């Protein structure tokens, strides 16, 4: 599972018992790892149907003993621009691959900050500028579909908007360099063309890498992540005292 996670929870510093929001949880990949680590996780998304699958997986994990006893995992459906949580409710917020979908991204960022405790930590991940720009150049379908990507962030723009919302960037990491060529191939042949042999072959390579984690691909990805990493993750903190902005 760790191979497909964009967030490094060791670097984020997740500890058992912390209340963590997965904002825009989607299919739940980060929420499941948070649950395994003993966090009190809330998977939040606008897609109630997808959250049903997440809730089913939470129940299966509990049944199989994959999460520490006494840990809670819940799902909540709603709007990221107006989340149904009290102020300063969460110790941490994870927002992975959500902001690029939202026309009102800055409003969502302010909501993230509102529900995060002072001194709390957050991580926001988005597609990296260069790999994403290549995808947009190769295919309109990639980003123009309903619910698709509405912008490409530069790292300075993303950190600037998050800073304006009240967060302090601490460090950043790029991830998934080996995934970028796959998406370039998909965009070149058509994102909806699932039968083309080139993307199929590359996808088999990615699955093999995920299952086997050989040193050669781990080394290659570590080398290439800063250059063509498909995603960039910005790790941030919320000051314990609000910092007035000029």
Indicate where each model-derived feature is located:
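A SAM-dependent methyltransferase catalytic signature shared across enzymes that methylate proteins
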Residues: 156-173
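A short His-aromatic
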Residues: 97-101
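Short, glycine-/aromatic-enriched active-site segment of Class I SAM-dependent methyltransferases
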Residues: 127-151, 159-160
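A short glycine-rich, Lys/Arg-flanked "PGG" loop and its adjoining helix->strand segment in the class I
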Residues: 106-121
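A short hydrophobic/small-residue beta-strand
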Residues: 41, 122-123
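Conserved catalytic loop of SAM-dependent methyltransferase domains
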Residues: 171-210, 229-231
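Alpha/beta-hydrolase-fold catalytic nucleophile elbow
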Residues: 125-127, 175
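Conserved N-terminal segment of class I S-adenosyl-L-methionine
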Residues: 1-86, 92-96, 106-109, 200-210, ...
């Amino acid at each position: 599972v760790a191979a497909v996670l964009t967030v490094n929870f060791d670097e984020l510093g997740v500890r058992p018992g912390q209340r963590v929001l997965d904002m825009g949880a989607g299919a739940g990949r980060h929420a499941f790892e948070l649950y395994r680590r003993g966090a009190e996780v809330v998977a939040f998304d606008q897609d109630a149907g997808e959250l049903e699958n997440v809730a089913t997986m939470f129940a299966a994990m509990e049944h199989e003993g994959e999460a520490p006893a006494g840990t809670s995992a819940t799902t909540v459906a709603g709007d990221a621009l107006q989340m149904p949580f009290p102020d300063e409710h969460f110790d941490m917020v994870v927002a992975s691959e959500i902001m690029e979908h939202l026309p009102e991204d800055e409003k969502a960022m302010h909501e993230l900050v509102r529900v995060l405790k002072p001194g709390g930590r957050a991580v926001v991940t988005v597609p990296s500028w260069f790999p994403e720009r290549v995808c947009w150049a190769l295919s309109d379908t990639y980003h123009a579909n309903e619910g698709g990507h509405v912008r490409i962030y530069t790292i300075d723009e993303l950190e600037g908007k998050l800073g304006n919302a009240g967060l302090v960037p601490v460090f950043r990491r790029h991830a998934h360099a080996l995934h970028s060529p796959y998406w370039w191939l998909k965009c070149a042949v058509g994102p909806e063309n699932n039968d083309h042999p080139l993307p199929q072959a590359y996808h088999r390579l990615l699955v093999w890498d995920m299952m086997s984690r050989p040193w050669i691909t781990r080394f290659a990805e570590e080398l290439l992540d800063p250059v063509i990493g498909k995603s960039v993750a910005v790790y941030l903190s919320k000051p314990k005292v609000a910092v007035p902005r000029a």
